[in-house]
């Protein structure tokens, strides 16, 4: 009985082990026939289900539902995408639109159209200009943020953004889109700050109007072996300034108790020697010089004149096509032209504590000048020299004593409000053409 139990257990273990061994295919199995094998260096061809790297896709349905006019707005909805250069950038603008994955820099983000690299958009940067990509032509967007540099090189350290355009389109489409920005500007906190500083309150505004027209047409060959697609888009977008929003109508200063302020380099003078008039003096609009007290209107509100949104006029024209020459060879082409005009406005230029020299007998320093009123601050008291005893003597006292004129120095800070804001205009024109055979 004991021997029988051992034999039964042995057969049971053997059967269990055999069931876990892998099966092998022998000669009687049918061979698998592969019609086509495609080897590619791009991991973007894999779906987000089978891809071995993180892949995010934005489809045509989501793109159309958002109604965006600019292609950078298509991907800006993702948390790992930062838009470095857009129409909202004024100070430091390049007149282009660039993408920045994971905040590692736009020069480390590779941008492709149908797997082909985009050219850079500015002579001062190697970053790709996505203004060349018309939003209406985008079928989907593939974004890879890991392992891309192993395939594409160091310019893909942050990742790859691949815009897949519409293929084999047949028919005619015309789209027109109009948008505007309306804001009630009813932020109570900002209204109080603007009121305390006696700054302009914009009230309700409608600004930043934008129009977008696009045409898309395509035709397939009669034999079904080829297609030609043409497209054209025109965009016209108006400017929007900081003063058009209550949150931008003044420059906020202070962290714990903010107040409307700005730059103090605004019609200021400083003496540079001895014990002249203490501190800084400010020139009122009527020319009178008064002590600088930090009054709100003694600061220059540079935020109000900066662009919130730059004006943009853009043309995109292009054509693409393909034709199967044989079962294994296909000819294709892709051409795109883009012309983009924009302007970036920032605050007036300024002299920041710039020294200048003059003589003590300068009429600006002596009596009789309207700035030297009896109740105000006199420039002649702000600077001077030292006598033989080492005591300070102002220019006015020095000249009143019958001495010869001497050279003196001032520190001046001034905003060039007379010359108007600084405006930089940009015009970028790019033509891209690709021809080839594939099979």
PLM segments and residue spans:
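N-terminal Sec signal peptide and the immediately downstream disordered periplasmic leader
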Residues: 1-66, 73-76, 214, 218-220, ...
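Extracellular/periplasmic catalytic domains that process cell-envelope and extracellular macromolecules
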Residues: 31-32, 103-105, 166-167, 222-223
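Structured loop/turn residues at beta-strand edges in well-structured enzyme cores
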Residues: 32, 104, 128, 136-139
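Short, basic and Ser/Thr-rich N-terminal targeting/leader segments
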Residues: 33, 95-97, 105, 315, ...
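Soluble periplasmic/extracytoplasmic beta-strand elements of cell-envelope proteins
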Residues: 35-40, 54-59, 64, 74, ...
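Short, solvent-exposed loop/turn elements at domain surfaces
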Residues: 45-49, 109-111, 182-185
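Extracytoplasmic beta-strand/coil segments of soluble accessory domains associated
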Residues: 72, 76-117
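Surface-exposed beta-strand-turn/loop segments characteristic
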Residues: 73, 77, 90, 116-132, ...
């Amino acid at each position: 009985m004991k021997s029988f139990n051992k034999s039964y257990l042995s057969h049971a273990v053997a059967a269990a082990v055999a069931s876990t061994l892998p099966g092998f295919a022998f000669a009687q199995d049918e061979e698998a026939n592969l019609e086509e094998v495609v080897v590619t260096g791009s991991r973007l061809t894999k779906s987000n289900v089978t891809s071995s790297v993180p892949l995010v896709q934005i489809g045509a349905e989501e793109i159309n539902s958002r109604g965006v006019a600019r292609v950078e707005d298509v991907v800006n909805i993702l948390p790992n995408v930062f838009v470095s250069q857009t129409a909202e950038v004024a100070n430091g603008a390049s007149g282009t639109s660039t993408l920045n994955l994971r905040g590692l820099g736009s020069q480390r983000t590779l941008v492709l159209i149908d797997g082909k690299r985009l050219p850079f958009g500015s002579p001062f940067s190697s970053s790709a200009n996505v203004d060349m990509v018309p939003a209406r032509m985008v079928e989907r967007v593939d974004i890879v943020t890991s392992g891309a540099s192993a395939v594409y090189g160091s310019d893909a350290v942050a990742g790859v953004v691949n815009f897949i355009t519409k293929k084999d389109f047949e028919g005619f489409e015309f789209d027109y889109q109009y948008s505007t920005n309306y804001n009630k500007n009813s932020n109570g906190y900002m209204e109080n700050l603007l009121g305390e500083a006696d700054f302009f309150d914009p009230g309700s505004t409608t600004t930043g109007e934008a129009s977008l027209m696009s045409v898309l047409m395509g035709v397939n060959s009669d034999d079904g072996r080829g297609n030609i697609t043409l497209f054209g888009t025109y965009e016209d977008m108006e400017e929007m300034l900081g003063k058009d929003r209550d949150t931008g109508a003044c420059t906020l200063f202070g962290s714990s108790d903010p107040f409307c302020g700005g730059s103090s380099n605004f019609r200021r003078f400083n003496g540079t020697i001895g014990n002249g008039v203490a501190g800084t003096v400010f020139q009122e609009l009527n020319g009178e010089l008064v002590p600088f007290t930090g009054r709100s209107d003694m600061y220059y509100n540079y935020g109000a004149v900066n662009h919130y949104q730059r004006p943009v006029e853009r043309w995109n024209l292009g054509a693409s096509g393909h034709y199967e020459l044989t079962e294994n060879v296909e000819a294709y082409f892709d051409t795109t032209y883009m012309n983009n005009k924009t302007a970036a406005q920032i605050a007036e230029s300024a002299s920041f504590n710039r020294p200048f020299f003059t003589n003590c007998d300068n009429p600006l320093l002596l009596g009789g000048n309207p700035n030297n009123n009896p109740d105000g601050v006199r420039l002649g008291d702000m600077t001077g020299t030292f006598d033989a005893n080492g005591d300070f003597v102002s220019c006015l006292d020095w000249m009143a004593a019958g001495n010869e004129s001497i050279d003196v120095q001032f520190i001046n800070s001034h905003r060039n409000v007379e010359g108007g804001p600084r405006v930089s205009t940009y015009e970028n024109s790019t033509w891209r053409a690709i021809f080839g055979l594939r099979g």
